[in-house]
């Protein structure tokens, strides 16, 4: 994902803090 480059386990969603 272009938004969350650290975690790509999520879909193309807005910048949201997912699980660590």
From Swiss-Prot:
Key words of the record: Calcium, Glycoprotein
Regions annotated as coiled coil: none
GO MF, one annotated term: calcium ion binding
Transmembrane segments: none
Record note on modification: Glycosylated.
Chain intervals for the UniProt region annotation (Disordered): 1-20
Function field: Appears to be a building block of the soluble organic matrix of the shell. The protein binds calcium.
Assembly description: Homodimer.
Record's protein name: Major extrapallial fluid protein
Biological source species: Mytilus edulis (Blue mussel)
